[in-house]
Design a protein with these regions (language model features):
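Short, contiguous pre-domain boundary segments
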Residues: 14-34, 198
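Generic structural signal for secondary-structure transition and capping sites
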Residues: 51-55, 102, 226
């Protein structure tokens, strides 16, 4: 650092990670550096060590319901296909031909017992086994060709389900999924317990790309502070809707900021925003509160019916149970481009009337045509554009700092949760500090293990101004 408080261009990635997040309670400073959203060097590290070395969400079992069904997705930069074989077993396989690497399945989903590569005609079973090589008998392959599965498709190192939610990991040395999810399993249980037979993904989805870093969406899904300003149009429209003339009833968005709520930070970067509903009777689940109480007990049923929850399972999915019910999957494409795919989920066996209400509520806020999603995407774009200017180094994350609690608050204890941090209001920002600290730990450990010391210089700025 020079006399002007500037960090030179020769500053390494490891140097920058040391100062990427400030969690200084003594001086009341809580912030993160904006270049963590803009630097391609950080993005490359994220893809390798966060997305391609840890557990990520893949799909829900209900999206591959029948024998020979398949569903395509991604783990970081790696294309993946999930298949259900003729015996009903699920498999997760790298979606790349073992011959020359062309993507094998090029549709989002379908039903096939075998896959033939369009490039050179190799055929594989949906378990990944190589079945046939085009013109193989006259090709003069060496004797070692296709022995002991050498040319089968590559299986994902770890592939597990929790309550029907499917996760995969490319790292053979990763901890078990149950340990990675940790305390968040209790919230996933709340979602899965909404019907005796669990939940299912409703047919159809929306997919869109925004011009911004993936962490903008990860933050925003648990940001209660932005709701009243960014989504004022949604709140105003719902306030003017004529419910007596068959308008779709909605969760009270006008009362969001004044409702009881809070935030939680968990191990491994997971986090959650919750609120207590002011009008829980408008949601389809409310009609089942007595059945839930009988099946689960009142202490477990009450929060399912009376609370909203936006649960971030780091690094790539939100399970949202609020204005409606949604699975939001985040896929980074580049440092400043992100794909989001959203699905509506619902309890299995719910009535046609309840399903219709759920979907109408979903359409009001979500989808690219909804009143919420486009507003968020504009803010992501605006943030990314301004970050590139480097006129200010820091994002302030100190809202609610005097109320943050290490460990569980009263609501968390009632739920049996043990977060590492609790915020007493839904607008508190401490959970972002914890999540970005996890980001730093993962990348720093990777650089130190690599032995390079993060010697790559900063790539996105010539000089970085240190702002006290």
């Amino acid at each position: 650092m020079n006399a002007k408080g500037e960090l030179p261009m020769s500053e390494t990635l490891l140097d920058r990670l040391e100062t990427a997040v400030v969690d200084d309670r003594e001086h009341g400073v809580f912030r993160c550096r904006r270049d963590i959203f803009t630097d391609p060097a950080f993005f490359d590290l994220e893809m390798t060590h966060i997305f391609e070395s840890n557990w990520v969400y893949l799909a829900h079992e209900s999206q591959i319901p029948e024998r020979n069904d398949y569903f395509t997705t991604w783990i970081g930069r790696k294309p993946v296909v999930i298949t259900r074989d003729k015996a009903g077993e699920l498999h997760a396989i790298i979606n790349a031909c073992a011959h020359r690497g062309a993507m094998l399945c090029r549709r989002k989903h379908g039903n096939k017992g075998t896959f033939t590569c369009p490039f050179h005609g190799w055929t594989f079973g949906n378990t990944g086994k190589l079945l046939k090589v085009k013109d193989g008998k006259t090709a003069d392959y060496p004797t070692t060709f296709d022995t002991e599965g050498s040319h089968d498709l590559t299986r994902i190192a770890h592939f597990e389900s929790y309550r029907g939610f499917l996760f995969g990991c490319l790292n053979p040395e990763a901890e078990p999924l149950s340990a990675y999810l940790g305390e968040t399993k209790r919230i996933i249980d709340q979602i899965a317990h909404q019907a005796p037979n669990g939940i299912e993904v409703v047919r159809g989805n929306s997919s869109y790309i925004y011009d911004g870093n993936w962490k903008l969406q990860i933050e925003n899904g648990a940001d209660g502070y932005h709701v009243s300003s960014v989504h004022w149009n949604y709140s105003a429209t719902m306030g003017r809707r004529n419910y007596e003339a068959d308008g779709v009833p909605t969760v009270d968005a006008n009362g969001w900021s004044r409702s009881v709520g809070g935030v939680y930070g968990f191990e491994n970067g997971h986090m959650m925003l919750w609120t207590r509903l002011l009008n829980p009777e408008v949601r389809p689940i409310y009609a089942h509160r007595e059945e839930l109480a009988r099946r689960l007990g009142e202490e477990h049923a009450a929060p399912i019916v009376e609370q909203t929850r936006n649960l971030c399972l780091y690094p790539n999915v939100y399970l949202m149970d609020q204005f409606s019910t949604q699975i939001r999957v985040i896929r980074p494409i580049s440092v400043d481009k992100t794909e989001v795919t959203i699905y509506c989920f619902a309890p299995k066996g719910e009535s046609a009337a309840e399903r219709a209400l759920r979907i109408r509520q979903y359409e009001d806020f979500f989808n690219v045509s909804g009143m919420g999603t486009p507003d968020d995407l504009e803010e992501f774009r605006a943030c990314q554009a301004a970050y590139a200017g480097n006129s200010q180094l820091w994002n302030d994350l100190s809202r609610g700092a005097t109320r943050w609690i290490d460990g569980p608050d009263e609501n968390a204890r009632a739920l049996g949760l043990k977060p590492t941090l609790s915020g007493e209001r839904s607008e508190d920002e401490g959970l972002f500090v914890r999540q970005h600290e996890h980001w730093v730990r993962v990348l720093r450990a990777a650089l130190l293990k690599d032995g390079s010391g993060g010697g790559q210089p900063a790539s996105s700025v010539k000089q970085i101004r240190s702002v006290a």
